[in-house]
């Protein structure tokens, strides 16, 4: 019993860190400079809410099994939607062209998993659900629950991979857009994504493989929450400091100028004079759009130049 209480206290720490981060992001939302940053803030708020719900389930799993059985649909739903919303944040930050709406089909699989668990909660008797989670008996309910857990894990891995691929593609294009090497690297986001895969598989594996795994690990669970808390803090601080570069979409006017070829033709001397006078290479926040505006030219032409 003491071990269960200790485990519950350990699992409550990520709930607190997510709540504090949620408050800080919420207070900063009104300061967001543009629509894109506000979208990122709203998505982060959603992620922190889902993380709080997930880790609250781990607390219940440790101290009150009956409560966890009733809470299971919420735990499943939050765990399945977290990777999608993290991918949504990556999708917004790494946008390199026209601002496209996030495809709704990304929410279909998590929604199906949620509906499946909710149907089990309403149809299957409580004791049968309890047995499917905590006993080693074989039944249709336990098979569905185990399969759903595995799909949730695979979903987290899949969207982590998609996020990393999108960051890789973004890095290739942002090099010609901004001189801010630190902010455009997104190393912090890649680290969070990779770290989270390892973090989430450990506690979920305890549920999939059986409660005995929790007992065998014992006090080592105290160390599994450290990456979670660290992830919450790193994500919060980087969003608050806007440690990323948003590539602005090409405006209609720029498209018109590019199509007509009606922009200033840049000569070597003119560019060298601009670099000598403005010294943009000393400004870490310099963007190619700034140079295009100053030279009355087009960003595509300047990139090629």
Where are these regions (language model features)?
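The cytoplasmic-loop to transmembrane-helix boundary for the fourth helix
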Residues: 94-123, 140-149, 180-196
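Membrane-water interface of transmembrane alpha-helices
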Residues: 21, 82, 157-171
């Amino acid at each position: 019993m003491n071990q269960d209480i200790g485990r519950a206290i350990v699992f409550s720490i990520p709930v607190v860190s997510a709540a504090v981060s949620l408050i800080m992001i919420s207070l900063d939302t009104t300061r967001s400079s543009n629509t894109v940053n506000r979208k990122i803030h709203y998505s982060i708020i959603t992620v922190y809410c889902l993380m709080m719900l997930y880790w609250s389930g781990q607390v219940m799993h440790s101290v009150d099994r009956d409560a966890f059985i009733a809470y299971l649909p919420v735990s499943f739903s939050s765990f399945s939607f977290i990777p999608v919303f993290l991918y949504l944040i990556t999708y917004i930050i790494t946008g390199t062209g026209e601002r496209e709406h996030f495809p709704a089909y990304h929410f279909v699989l998590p929604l199906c998993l949620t509906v499946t668990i909710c149907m089990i909660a309403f149809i299957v008797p409580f004791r049968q659900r309890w047995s499917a989670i905590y006993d080693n008996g074989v039944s249709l309910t336990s098979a569905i629950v185990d399969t759903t857990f595995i799909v949730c894990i695979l979903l987290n891995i899949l969207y982590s991979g998609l996020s990393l691929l999108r960051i890789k593609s973004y890095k290739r294009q942002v090099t010609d857009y901004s001189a801010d090497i630190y902010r455009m690297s997104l190393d912090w986001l890649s680290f969070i994504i990779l770290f989270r895969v390892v973090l989430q598989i450990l506690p979920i594996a305890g549920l999939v493989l059986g409660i005995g795994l929790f007992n065998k690990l014992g006090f080592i669970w105290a160390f599994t929450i450290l990456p979670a808390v660290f992830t919450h803090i790193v994500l919060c601080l980087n969003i608050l400091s806007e440690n990323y570069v948003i590539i602005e979409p090409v405006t209609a006017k720029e498209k018109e100028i590019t199509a007509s070829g009606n922009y200033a033709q840049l000569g070597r001397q003119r560019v060298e004079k601009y670099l000598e006078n403005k010294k943009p290479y000393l400004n870490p926040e310099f963007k190619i759009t700034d140079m295009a505006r100053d030279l009355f030219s087009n960003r595509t032409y300047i990139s090629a130049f």
